[in-house]
């Protein structure tokens, strides 16, 4: 797309966010980015947790507890307004640095904003080593519609 139209500008912003190393940003940049990402989230459509079918309704099973509280989602995870989402992050926990890449790590970091990469970098610096496979960290969701936090 032409970078002068909305779609082109959005792709360019995403690509620049993807290659940006974690670092503090000018507050005015962050404010503008947050406005744009919130508008983009609204345009995609936010899915509230109450709209999600539970596994109890889809797969009746008496051996699984809390089937009326567990949902499976197939779609754009960045649209969900839920308590937490889980990202298949890499061991550096900094997100995907490939511009416009279609992986879930890139999608989450692109929808959350540069603050997520910054927070992940701070967590990893304090930890002092890469994240072992199968472990997770809890971060804020920033511009994701996820309610209180996002799990990585």
What are these regions (language model features)?
Residues 1-152:
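Macrodomain-like recognition of ADP-ribose-binding/processing modules
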């Amino acid at each position: 797309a032409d970078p002068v139209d909305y779609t082109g500008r959005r792709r360019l912003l995403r690509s620049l966010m993807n290659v940006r190393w974690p670092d503090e940003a000018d507050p005015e940049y962050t404010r503008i980015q947050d406005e744009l990402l919130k508008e983009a989230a609204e345009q995609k459509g936010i899915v509230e947790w109450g709209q999600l079918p539970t596994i109890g309704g889809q797969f009746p099973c008496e051996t699984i507890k809390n089937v009326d509280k567990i949902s499976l989602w197939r779609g754009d995870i960045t649209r969900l307004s839920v308590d937490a989402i889980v990202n298949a992050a890499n061991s550096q926990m900094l997100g995907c640095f490939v511009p416009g890449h279609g992986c879930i790590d890139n999608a989450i970091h692109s929808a959350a904003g540069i603050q997520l990469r910054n927070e992940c970098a701070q967590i990893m610096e304090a930890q002092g080593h890469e994240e072992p496979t199968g472990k997770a960290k809890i971060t804020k969701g920033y511009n994701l519609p996820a309610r209180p936090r996002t799990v990585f």
